[in-house]
């Protein structure tokens, strides 16, 4: 056997790519040579065998041994004579020959398939016309050696024709190439090349592509589109003649580079160039695959002419290529590895450019030979081969990855190149930035799309609402859980409040701030402000005081409408008049004011600002009137419709909820505060009120869909007629799931705050949804009197399919930014296509689709939206940089794991900090400071300290290199054993979206929570064909412990999780005891595992039924004593005080939205039975658990919960607090904090020292996984102190 050789040059990459690919023939290369003339086929067949025998790489065998791949020359391999096939009598000789060759290529031709890696056929299709088919595996040849072998066979054939001996082999043994390559890898030259490419990478611009699909995450494909562009009409030749000082190859390259740059909308980009890697090397005459594709930056100036571009490219590229050739032996794969890029990351380059210098001409007397390429191996994006010929013409062959391109698009792109050449032929002095890439007819197409002119009346919101109220005075207009107003009654309330505003000094043109919870009074307040001629300024009471103060300082409203409990938050805002409003007013019978004018500002909404300060967007009456009239025309409401108001008033989508129903005679129903965050609450809300029209942010739609079963969808969604989505990209798969579950029509809307809510629309159901090919539904077509423009960097329109910057025009544009004329001027610019008009740059990147709709592709800056909330990462960065001892700070949005993913946008904010002093930062304390300044949706869920921020090759921040927060076991243990442990580990992985290779991996530390525990139990029950309960998952939450239980006796473990002691985690240090809430179960505390340091044990204390302390005790003191007897414990209302009385140390006492029993009337609650809200909460939990376990949950659990709730009320009727002389930490649920309730006052008689952390959630959510994202780190920091 010959010497075993390692794989070298391109071979390792080819081997690995084939192993990872599921395509059977991706790495085969093939062409056929069309021979016209008299051919001696048997003699040519002999020449083929002789020629193949001279190239030793064609006799290579490959084997894998202990992870290493070896190759050797099989000297015993004998090539058979190629088959000669005569198709002259066939009906379609050419088609049949093509089918034969393609059939060969469609076989499994992988290197280990057993099929020949080398294959030739001679197919006669006519007298004196042959197809010589040749196919090789890419491990044996490359694009240089393939034609070289063909030429050598032709030489042998000619010698045989002349009766001469077979010419000697011109090919170098591949062993010489391997030896030389190994020496190179160990040489200083390799080190110099590595250093050269490190520096090259630093200067390299980003890659570009003609496809809108991202380059990252896409693999090469052997499914390829081929397009040959022939420029034989003389225009390239004419241009070359006019530019006589420019080489034809340089001109061809300049035209192609400019064409790519303009169609990519990127004038600086990285392209791939093919290097032979043979000159001065043993590989010069070897046949193995040694070609290299290396990155090179292309730089185009918009203000230069084509001759200047060609000359500069030629000069610069010549110098650059000369340097690169000295370092061309360095593997492209090694450059990628050196850059730190992982598989699936963005590649170094997109399109590959290749000016063909390989000689495909065959010198056979009396025979013309033309080569036709069939397969060249996989293509990542585009490969362009340029063929400038000796006649002065140009042809370009395009190979395109079919996963990224379609044939009509490629043909259009080819037409644009022809048009580009024609423009330069007509005017060689034309600037590169001014050349037109729009095809004839495309301007008219875009003009037709934007032909949205519709005459609308000159009116205002208040006038439209008053007009409808006069038509249907007795129809129901506005309702919440407590009130119902007819149109007449609502109008009377609005006028009464508007007059009160006037009395308080509000004048037309003023602004009025509103800080009210969601109720009928919020709607009435907004309408009254408009009635008084003012603009409303919504204040989200969930925002920190500092941020609200900034908004008020900038807006300077003439009045604040709020409630008594919120008023203290604004006490330090100077010169702010206030009005507390939470009850109906007595109608005065006054005439309507209707002081608004069409030119007035209707509302001011603050959005995130990159400067670190929020910016107020002012939207006028005419803009929002246009938006509402369009919506009523396009999606008409009637008096039978019920519209849900569930969007927070600080989000501009709420505007149409507050006003659209009242211009159409429909009814608006107000969801309870924060109900929009609870899918089960929304199900009940829709069903109770018969809602027909509602809105979801896509991520909340995903959560709502996840909560539905076919049965609950029929119950809660049956009345829905139209559902709207906006605020984020809308996943097409989510729409399909919604359609299958509910059948309710879904509509995608798009628009920034700066353009009256929405400016475009697209159906997200039915036939339109079926035609969506991308991952997201298009943002669609413009609304009335509005235009969409997609422009390149030179402000030229881009053609369909080409990515560009999205601009908005028309009547709906905002008036500007409050008090920021500089920012207004920079974002609302003059419209170059409509003199005297304005245009707003959205910062969104988009493209036109063939049907005229717009597809959103992403952002061109650091702004993003998460669950509909606009976020400027720069604003968070600046606030973090102001924190103590922080030198550098950056924010990144990422999916931490899949446990929280619901099919929508699962990204969360992570903050990265670099310390000024180099000392460890107290990230929990810093996070608490951020909550005092930033609204909840802008506070990173976790802060990570880094020694330094990662930089990309060009010295910029490399966001992709920022580490993800690790939610995993602290130290690796043994691997799961085959059997139960392996099955359980796989179940963990599938539910949590992370790799589980440790038998001690904890389900909750990895991101699980109680609902996911339900799903896990249901899944394992099916897999093991025995009942696995959620309680067992709670108690035995690691892979190994759960396997032990499942493999043990079923009866003995069934009560696990339902006992008094709930061991949630075992550590080697102190223990945190978690007392059950009124439900009697402590399962919700399972998520604490992911926040507390590993030495902490976590134990839940429960009250199961029957015989639990809550059921058997006559008063709360007995419950406390019973639990104290079970374990030394800390808990309000007695346990902590009892421990102190016994002389025990209480290191930490935590209270989760807990209040002294003396602050409420528990006797009245007991007399009235279980609170409806409590029953609703239990029902929501039941529905969620049933959905998680697919209906298999026992009713016993919820019977116990209901019993415990009733007992809790009974026990609290006689309970009395006991003073505690230590320190406690109280977490207050702000959203359900009763008016006038002060936690400081309520607890001051009973607790000596109290730390209070206000949480942006409701009481029912205080122990939810979402709440523990904020609470968990605070508990950890407190315990560590």
From Swiss-Prot:
Region of interest (Elongation/condensation), ranges: 1-301
A biological process term (GO) from this entry: enterobactin biosynthetic process
GO CC, any one term: enterobactin synthetase complex
Cofactors named for this entry: pantetheine 4'-phosphate
Residue(s) carrying O-(pantetheine 4'-phosphoryl)serine: 1010
Subcellular location: Cytoplasm
Chain residue ranges for the region called Adenylation: 486-891
GO molecular function: 2,3-dihydroxybenzoate-serine ligase activity; ATP binding; nucleotidyltransferase activity; phosphopantetheine binding
Catalytic activity: 3 2,3-dihydroxybenzoate + 3 L-serine + 6 ATP = enterobactin + 6 AMP + 6 diphosphate + 4 H(+); holo-[peptidyl-carrier protein] + L-serine + ATP = L-seryl-[peptidyl-carrier protein] + AMP + diphosphate
Cofactor note: Binds 1 phosphopantetheine covalently.
Role, per record: Involved in the biosynthesis of the siderophore enterobactin (enterochelin), which is a macrocyclic trimeric lactone of N-(2,3-dihydroxybenzoyl)-serine. EntF catalyzes the activation of L-serine via ATP-dependent PPi exchange reaction to form seryladenylate. Activated L-serine is loaded onto the peptidyl carrier domain via a thioester linkage to the phosphopanthetheine moiety, forming seryl-S-Ppant-EntF.
Protein family membership: Belongs to the ATP-dependent AMP-binding enzyme family. EntF subfamily.
Name assigned to this protein: Enterobactin synthase component F
Organism: Shigella flexneri
Native organism taxonomy: Bacteria, Pseudomonadati, Pseudomonadota, Gammaproteobacteria, Enterobacterales
Gene name of the record: entF
